[in-house]
């Protein structure tokens, strides 16, 4: 374009000179606009390249750090056994021998306590880092991460029991100031007992849904271990984790598996169960305070539980979960039939009258079987006839009462 401007013909007259100058100015303005646009594009490219440079430099530093970490020698795992002074401690390495070692200046001396796990430098064996407390994998498996979906409204016929468990477990966690105002200690343990299928575990699941406390669930048989001391260690770590994450609730289902009365048994298995029970008694109400940890126990056999387990201070409230009466059965049937397509001729109270002696689990099965009969008969909705067939089938399929009442020997 510059050559074009330089080779424009020379103007001969005034009018030609005007047009010549106007055209030259226009060309210069266009050239200026073009150069400005190129400048903006170059500056944008420069900013993009600078951003890319910073990103690549960051990635290079990251990869260099990973390479250095891979090149660094591994650290030795040890356990602090004794504190000599602010600069020296006695540790036991993972190999077994004990050493008197120094402490890294970057560590907080208050974190170094006997029993703490630490990492040691391979050359000097100086303490480099304090590791978090390690719990058995089974203990982490007892944590309830996702709250159950059951609610108190879905439990029928247990209004009194629900109020008692909410007062003993939920109220101290949500309104502790009420107990401080009255000058009393809130209940720390609740034992639910009653026949199978009456809703003990369902109540505990509703508590887990309702409270915002950390919830840990364990079956009593999980605490029975093969080797000496393993069951007691699990109990100790379970309560340590509960205290660490307090406020928390520990639910021990089928507690009679480890809580049966102690007898003069000569078998090693029974003695190990007794050791586990004694550790549980000490953790529930022993020398040290267990903190803001609530305990819910559930059992079908309260008659065989050890007396030391039932005393106040361990289980302050013992709540019986009985088989539902007529009103309770009506409430339970209404809950289970709420989502079913039922004929209007079906009288829930009449069905409740016909199911005398049945518990909540039985009533749920009766509703499910009635729905299955309706599907089998290709009905549009569940009819009274379907419920009658379900009740008859449930009574005749298995001689449940005769099986329950039949006495027999128990084999280990």
Curated annotation (Swiss-Prot):
Q: Where are the residues of the annotated region Docks into pockets in the proteasome alpha-ring to cause gate opening?
A: 410-412
Q: Which SUPFAM superfamilies match?
A: P-loop containing nucleoside triphosphate hydrolases
The gene designation is: pan
For this chain, the family text in UniProt reads:
Belongs to the AAA ATPase family.
Q: Which residues bind ATP?
A: 197-202, 336
Q: In UniProt terms, what function does this protein have?
A: ATPase which is responsible for recognizing, binding, unfolding and translocation of substrate proteins into the archaeal 20S proteasome core particle. Is essential for opening the gate of the 20S proteasome via an interaction with its C-terminus, thereby allowing substrate entry and access to the site of proteolysis. Thus, the C-termini of the proteasomal ATPase function like a 'key in a lock' to induce gate opening and therefore regulate proteolysis.
Quaternary organization: Homohexamer. The hexameric complex has a two-ring architecture resembling a top hat that caps the 20S proteasome core at one or both ends. Upon ATP-binding, the C-terminus of PAN interacts with the alpha-rings of the proteasome core by binding to the intersubunit pockets.
Coiled-coil-forming residues are: 15-72
Among PANTHER family, the record links this protein to: 26S PROTEASOME REGULATORY SUBUNIT (PTHR23073)
Tell me the domain comment: Consists of three main regions, an N-terminal coiled-coil domain that may assist in substrate recognition, an interdomain involved in PAN hexamerization, and a C-terminal ATPase domain of the AAA type.
Please state what the protein is called.
Proteasome-activating nucleotidase
Give any single GO term for biological process: protein unfolding
One Gene Ontology term of the molecular function aspect: ATP binding
Which source organism? Methanosphaerula palustris (strain ATCC BAA-1556 / DSM 19958 / E1-9c)
């Amino acid at each position: 374009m510059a050559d074009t401007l330089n080779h424009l013909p020379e103007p001969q007259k005034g009018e030609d000179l005007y047009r010549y100058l106007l055209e030259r100015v226009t060309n210069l303005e266009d050239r200026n606009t073009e150069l400005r646009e190129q400048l903006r594009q170059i500056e944008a490219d420069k900013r993009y390249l600078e951003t890319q440079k910073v990103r690549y430099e960051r990635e290079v530093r990251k990869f260099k750090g990973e390479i250095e970490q891979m090149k660094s020698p591994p650290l030795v795992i040890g356990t602090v056994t004794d504190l000599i002074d602010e600069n020296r401690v006695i540790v036991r390495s993972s190999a077994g021998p004990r050493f008197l070692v120094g402490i890294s200046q970057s560590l907080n001396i208050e974190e170094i306590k006997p029993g703490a796990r630490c990492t040691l430098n391979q050359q000097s064996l100086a303490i480099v880092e304090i590791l978090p407390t390690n719990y058995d994998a089974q203990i982490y498996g007892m944590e309830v991460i996702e709250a159950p979906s059951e609610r108190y409204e879905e439990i029928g016929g247990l209004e009194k029991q629900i109020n008692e468990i909410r007062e003993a477990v939920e109220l101290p966690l949500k309104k502790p100031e009420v107990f401080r105002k009255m000058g009393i200690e809130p209940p720390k343990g609740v034992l639910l007992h009653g026949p199978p299928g009456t809703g003990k575990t369902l109540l505990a699941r509703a508590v887990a849904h309702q409270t915002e406390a950390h919830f840990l669930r364990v079956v009593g048989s999980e605490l029975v271990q093969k080797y000496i001391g393993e069951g007691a260690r699990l109990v100790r770590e379970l309560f340590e984790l509960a205290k660490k994450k307090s406020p928390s609730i520990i639910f021990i289902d089928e507690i009679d598996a480890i809580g049966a009365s102690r007898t003069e048994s000569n078998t090693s298995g029974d003695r190990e169960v007794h050791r586990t029970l004694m550790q549980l008694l000490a953790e529930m109400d022993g020398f040290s305070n267990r903190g803001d940890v609530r305990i819910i126990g559930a059992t079908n056999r309260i008659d065989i539980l050890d007396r030391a387990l039932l005393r106040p201070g361990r289980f302050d409230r013992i709540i019986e979960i009985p088989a539902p009466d007529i009103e309770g059965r009506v409430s339970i049937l209404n809950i289970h039939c709420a989502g079913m397509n039922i004929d209007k001729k079906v009288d829930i109270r009449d069905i409740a009258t016909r199911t005398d002696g049945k518990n909540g689990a039985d009533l749920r099965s009766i509703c499910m079987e009635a729905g299955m009969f309706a599907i089998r008969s290709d009905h549009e909705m569940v009819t009274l006839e379907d419920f009658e067939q379900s009740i008859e089938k449930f009574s005749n399929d298995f001689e449940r009462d005769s099986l329950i009442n039949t006495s027999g020997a128990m084999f280990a």
